[in-house]
Amino acid sequence: MLPPGRNRTAQPARLGLQRQLAQVDAPAGSATPLGPAQVVTAGLLTLLIVWTLLGNVLVCAAIVRSRHLRAKMTNIFIVSLAVSDLFVALLVMPWKAVAEVAGYWPFGTFCDIWVAFDIMCSTASILNLCIISVDRYWAISRPFRYERKMTQRVALVMVGLAWTLSILISFIPVQLNWHRDKAGSQGQEGLLSNGTPWEEGWELEGRTENCDSSLNRTYAISSSLISFYIPVAIMIVTYTRIYRIAQVQIRRISSLERAAEHAQSCRSRGAYEPDPSLRASIKKETKVFKTLSMIMGVFVCCWLPFFILNCMVPFCSSGDAEGPKTGFPCVSETTFDIFVWFGWANSSLNPIIYAFNADFRKVFAQLLGCSHFCFRTPVQTVNISNELISYNQDTVFHKEIATAYVHMIPNAVSSGDREVGEEEEEGPFDHMSQISPTTPDGDLAAESVWELDCEEEVSLGKISPLTPNCFDKTA
């Protein structure tokens, strides 16, 4: 998004104007050669723009091509995210890249429209990320209600609200000049952003060669709240809750696996070998934690520095030579530019984070014409869905075990349409761990107890009914 006035200094504008005048005075047919730093900058920014375009186009094409992907409501939000990131790569990045390499804004009065596109596309991308987190939390915490309520119409309404809000806080304030700092705007006649008067002949050139506007404090704070701070707070809450629910489900699956293996070892009367299912469940919890941490970490690292400066810079002092500076110190132009591009770079990473699962990889391979060569190495990823949370390769196995074990116990009905509460997350596992105690190697007493436990005949009629959470609260 747009840096609000940077240092409120005329120096970058004067340097850019001098470069323009030098180019006008240069002989016809000659052009100022780019320096090494400009060439490197142009190359890196071009790669970033091309990668962002290709990644998001591939995501949209995969969903349009695959009926299976179109059937999932979540992918409506993925398409909306990809479209907003495509707009960032088409309507925002190229113009700024040219200005970075040239050293000034060469597109004249297109500046105001570009500013509106910048705010709209960046806000839409962030709001779509927030909607995806809410959608996943709703799907996992209340899966049956989610299946009933999350229709295509509801999904489109949510997407429409995100885009409407993005347009409202971008085009309307920018076109009506509500976003500018009245005291320090470059649009003020004869004045620079720091109040320094322009020479009469340089006024028009100075306004058009530098596209950075001075945001007023009200707009900078309110737009930052809507575009970033409120969405990031929602994302932190939802992904924290998703992780806690994932913990519950993974441990529940691990307990069912141990119980099923215990029953099988009793029937075969073979030597029992403790299964490392507990270690596997810990690994899966770690995998879920890493996945969610990556989602939040990339988003926060890309956008947080910019939005901190976005709220801080309007309070910067103009720093006149005759008086001392007051307020926050202003940041350099280079620092602000780096953080702006960091935020836009998030649009190039979103396709990797949100669309690089097994279903998308298969369609990607078909679109790229390399079904036999692309993505042949199996990659274990975590499914964050309304089904059991597990590795892709183990999902069917876990469901079979869960179904078989539930059928073994009468009245064992789990609450599928109720949110997992905090009271469920700690207590139940102590009871479940008693179903399949592990035997330490070399402990004769423990092995004897285990053999007696296997030899004892269990009557299903004697099993007392369980609570709705599959756990008996009585001794």
Swiss-Prot record:
Extracellular compartment segments: 1-38, 103-111, 180-215, 318-335
Main location (coarse class): membrane
Cell location: Cell membrane
MF terms in GO: dopamine binding; dopamine neurotransmitter receptor activity; dopamine neurotransmitter receptor activity, coupled via Gs; G protein-coupled receptor activity; G-protein alpha-subunit binding
InterPro entries found in the cross-reference section: Dopamine_D5_rcpt, Dopamine_rcpt, GPCR_Rhodpsn, GPCR_Rhodpsn_7TM
Coiled-coil positions: none
GO BP annotations, alphabetical order: adenylate cyclase-activating adrenergic receptor signaling pathway; adenylate cyclase-activating dopamine receptor signaling pathway; adenylate cyclase-activating G protein-coupled receptor signaling pathway; associative learning; cellular response to catecholamine stimulus; G protein-coupled dopamine receptor signaling pathway; long-term synaptic depression; mating behavior
Protein name listed in UniProt: D(1B) dopamine receptor
Name of the encoding gene: Drd5
Annotated PANTHER family: ADRENERGIC RECEPTOR-RELATED G-PROTEIN COUPLED RECEPTOR, D(1B) DOPAMINE RECEPTOR
Similarity comment: Belongs to the G-protein coupled receptor 1 family.
Record-linked Pfam families: 7tm_1
Region (Disordered): 415-443
Entry keyword Membrane: yes
Lipid tethering residues (S-palmitoyl cysteine): 370
Record membrane topology: Multi-pass membrane protein
Residues that span the membrane, as ranges: 39-64, 76-102, 112-134, 154-179, 216-240, 290-317, 336-357
Disulfide-linked positions: 111-211
